[in-house]
Amino acid sequence: MYLFHLCLVFACVPCPTVQASKLCLGWLWDMDIDPYKEFGSSYQLLNFLPLDFFPDLNALVDTAAALYEEELTGREHCSPHHTAIRQALVCWEELTRLITWMSENTTEEVRRIIVDHVNNTWGLKVRQTLWFHLSCLTFGQHTVQEFLVSFGVWIRTPAPYRPPNAPILSTLPEHTVIRRRGGSRAARSPRRRTPSPRRRRSQSPRRRRSQSPASNC
């Protein structure tokens, strides 16, 4: 339904339906919806990362297909991160179809404006979403949260009072990614070496030294 309203607004058709579409979309845009809250993060933390930090969509889609194609295309519910990736891929596919349709029915100038706007707004949001959930599946959700908080603190600290290099996700405490039965993955913290127990002395009775013949004299 919202895709239909977006199509009418971008087409700029002078009819009462466009006004209704703007009202409908205005109600949607005024809602304070943050899809990262349930994962312990927020839009604000992700916006601290620069725009060129996130890989392009083709690289993210290829990564998702290479690592989690079985889970994403299966019927089972693996995790909320898998569900979010599915929804992001479906939304981007539908948006691409809308852009294709509008490109065929609008002028070159209008098409260029629309494509630039989509890449700088919705395209960026899809890149952020895919990066966040793929990183949570790869490194662990808690590790990604620590990275976002650390980077947010680093970027807001004046340059003379902060380290020269920004935090890097791969240098944070590592988690071993293991695959459970059923295709799901879980993060396991590295094992700590426990001190080996001391060897107990043999409790067998000591042998008496045999007395030499000279001691009997």
Swiss-Prot record:
GO terms for cellular component: extracellular region; host cell; host cell cytoplasm; host cell nucleus; T=4 icosahedral viral capsid. Residues 189-211 are annotated as: 3 X 8 AA repeats of S-P-R-R-R-R-S-Q. The keyword Disulfide bond applies. Its main location: secreted. It comes from the Viruses. It is found in: Secreted; Host nucleus. The keyword Signal applies. Residues 178-210 have a biased composition (Basic residues). Sequence repeats lie at residues 189-195, 196-203, 204-211. Keywords: Disulfide bond, Host nucleus, Host-virus interaction, Repeat, Secreted, Signal, Viral immunoevasion. Residues 189-217 form a propeptide. The record marks 188-189 as: Cleavage. GO terms for molecular function: DNA binding; RNA binding; structural molecule activity. Residues 1-20 form the signal peptide. Residues 166-217 are annotated as: Disordered. GO terms for biological process: microtubule-dependent intracellular transport of viral material towards nucleus; symbiont entry into host cell; viral penetration into host nucleus. Residues 26-28 are annotated as: HBEAG. Phosphorylated. Cleaved by host furin. Homodimerizes. Belongs to the orthohepadnavirus precore antigen family. May regulate immune response to the intracellular capsid in acting as a T-cell tolerogen, by having an immunoregulatory effect which prevents destruction of infected cells by cytotoxic T-cells. This immune regulation may predispose to chronicity during perinatal infections and prevent severe liver injury during adult infections. This is External core antigen. It comes from Ground squirrel hepatitis virus (strain 27). The gene is C.
